[in-house]
Amino acid sequence: MNVISAMMEIAANPQTAEGKPTTPITYDSNCLEEICGSCAMRINGKARMACSSLVDNLEQPIRVEPLSKFPLVRDLQVDRSVLFENLMRVKAWVPVDGTYDLGSGPRVFPQQQEANYPLSNCISCTCCMEVCPQFNEATGFVGAATIAQVKLFNNHPTGKVFAEERLRALSGDGGIQECGFAQNCVEACPKQLPLTEAISDMNRDVIVQKVKDFLRG
């Protein structure tokens, strides 16, 4: 049994420690198979996915807490809107003009597919942001997940149209310069994304972009 299944059973018959009926605990959950990223929480003090955390593999008693870096909604539910705001800030999408037939689109070669696929596995769970010492209100750091998505879309043959804008966004306030390279993110990521590699690559590209902008005047 995983943690989220145990919580669902508790929610079906919620009781206080004294055995009195009470309201069910509030938490986010959807896919139950580590795809949607919604059930991220602190389990025994560690940011992880409740759906892939097995009860038998955890130290007992199990302590569950909400993620601490995000506004608390209620119980274990938090507001992770900041991630999506950051993704909008760096234009983390592929622009598509639907007013005419786009055809089959550009060819993506196997080498590109192999390089990009790991980054496409991000489930927006925000575990990387939770464990990052630089992700806080003071720095406004966009976080590893956002930086990794910049690399993904800048490597996409259609997404490249916004490449310079994305790099400029990463060079601004709360951008890549706030990363202290603690590498907590890559340890916490449930999908084993190459986050530190993405950060290093984007740091290089940001510097190159700043030099280009300087020379252009």
Task: Show which residues each predicted segment covers.
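Conserved phosphate-handling catalytic cores of large alpha/beta enzymes
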Residues: 39
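Short, compositionally biased
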Residues: 55-57
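Short strand-turn-strand beta-turns centered on an Asx-Gly dipeptide
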Residues: 43-45
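Serine/threonine-rich, repeat-prone extracellular segments and beta-strand-based repeat modules
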Residues: 28-33
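Ferredoxin-type iron-sulfur electron-transfer modules in oxidoreductases and energy-metabolism complexes
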Residues: 2-23, 64-217
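Charged interaction scaffolds used for protein-protein
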Residues: 51-53
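A short, basic-hydrophobic beta/loop patch
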Residues: 60-62
